[in-house]
Amino acid sequence: MNIYDVLIWMALGMTALLIQYGIWRYLKGKGKDTIPLQICGFLANFFFIFALAWGYSSFSEREYQAIGMGFIFFGGTALIPAIITYRLANHPAKKIRESSDSISA
């Protein structure tokens, strides 16, 4: 392992931190920074970074089919919690119906 490999792994770690911070800021800005949404966002972030790490390590080992498999499997897995987090964060609040004083026929 040379210095370039170490720098790439460090860059992946910093990218994971920056993405997680962005998820936290996004959810906090929406006013929906709850624990389940944070966990769901973390899982999306984890699988995305894991797919990138899998792709890089497979490329450095010259396993080109494993790169595609990692992107499809782990990248596709990252889409599920990412979509759930996005949909729940942008879900409008329920409108409360105003009860009327009179009964309509």
Curated annotation (Swiss-Prot):
It is a multi-pass membrane protein. The chain crosses the membrane at residues 3-23, 35-55, 66-86. Induction: Coexpressed with pceA. It is found in: Cell membrane. The keyword Ribonucleoprotein does not apply. The keyword Hydrolase does not apply. GO terms for cellular component: plasma membrane. Keywords: Cell membrane, Membrane, Transmembrane, Transmembrane helix. Belongs to the PceB family. May act as a membrane anchor for the tetrachloroethene reductive dehalogenase PceA. This is Probable tetrachloroethene reductive dehalogenase membrane anchor protein.
